[in-house]
From Swiss-Prot:
Keyword field contains S-adenosyl-L-methionine: yes
EC number: 2.1.1.33
Single Gene Ontology MF annotation: tRNA (guanine(46)-N7)-methyltransferase activity
UniProt-annotated binding residues for S-adenosyl-L-methionine: D35, E60, N87, D113
Catalytic activity as recorded in UniProt: guanosine(46) in tRNA + S-adenosyl-L-methionine = N(7)-methylguanosine(46) in tRNA + S-adenosyl-L-homocysteine
One Gene Ontology CC term in the entry: tRNA methyltransferase complex
Keywords: Methyltransferase, S-adenosyl-L-methionine, Transferase, tRNA processing
InterPro entries: SAM-dependent_MTases_sf, tRNA_(Gua-N-7)_MeTrfase_Trmb, tRNA_methyltr_TrmB_bact
Catalytic residues in the record: D113
Pathway terms, separated by semicolons: tRNA modification; N(7)-methylguanine-tRNA biosynthesis
Top EC class, one word: transferase
SUPFAM superfamilies (alphabetical): S-adenosyl-L-methionine-dependent methyltransferases
Name used for this protein in its record: tRNA (guanine-N(7)-)-methyltransferase
Length: 236
């Protein structure tokens, strides 16, 4: 059972200083994979040993999950993985701005909490300011991967990403939704959904060479995004 927290509550609006790659990793110059909303960390705990040439950072807003994930990481002695507690829409932009050029090479947002209602729009994980920060940190050709089992969760993300004009789908990807996960291990949620015979909606994007838009312009477009597939979740 997924337990939500309100990212707009006062506690989660307090900025948290995040450690730099140099503070987290002995080999800090490795390419960096950022997993936003890593939950208990099972995905990264499985991925990090398979990709020792990468550093992996998982960020999560639920502190008990981060503590649990860090304990597991330490037991496994994974030196190319760290888990951080923060509200990404409060604390991540400054951290991204400080990264060395082209260190961030892959971003994943997988099965984010489903805030359906329009009045909860600002609680969704992918906000315009975060997308612009990611687009600024990612160099052309670097990748952003999103997936969810809820169409009305991923469609607004897709619309926001595509309205930014900063990302394009790979030229050989002509399907509405990507069939296979490009990553070598699934998340816990992904395994559960597929075991139930249900669909997972996926999109892989590559950063293009377009300049990131002004925040006010993207926010204006974002206000038009209102869960096109799930009318039953809209406010009365």
């Amino acid at each position: 059972m997924r337990q939500h927290v309100n990212p707009l509550s006062r506690f989660f609006q307090l900025p948290r200083p995040l450690p730099s790659p140099e503070e987290m990793f002995a080999q800090s110059s490795r390419p960096l994979h950022l997993d936003i909303g890593c939950a208990r960390g099972g995905f990264l705990l499985s991925l990090a040993p398979l990709q020792p040439e990468w550093n992996h950072v998982g960020v999560e807003i639920r502190h008990p999950l981060v503590l649990s994930a860090e304990r597991d990481r330490q037991e496994l002695e994974l030196d190319n993985l760290r888990f951080l507690f923060c509200n990404v829409n409060v604390s991540l932009e400054e951290w991204l701005d400080a990264l060395p050029r082209d260190q961030l090479q892959w971003v994943s947002i997988q099965f984010p909490d489903p805030w359906f209602k329009r009045r909860h729009q600002k609680r969704r994980v992918l906000q315009p300011s975060l997308l612009i920060a990611l687009a600024t940190a990612l160099q052309p050709g670097r990748e952003l991967f999103i997936q969810s089992d809820v169409l009305s969760v991923i469609e607004p993300m897709v619309m926001l990403i595509e309205q930014s004009n900063c990302f394009e789908r790979p030229k050989n990807d002509s399907h509405a939704w990507q069939k296979a996960n490009p990553l070598p291990v699934p998340t816990e949620r992904e395994r559960y959904v597929l075991d139930q015979g249900l669909q997972v909606y996926r999109r892989l994007y590559q950063r293009n060479d377009q300049q990131a838009p002004e925040l006010s312009n993207l926010e204006a477009l974002w206000q038009q995004v209102d869960n096109p597939s799930k009318e039953e979740h809209s406010d009365c």
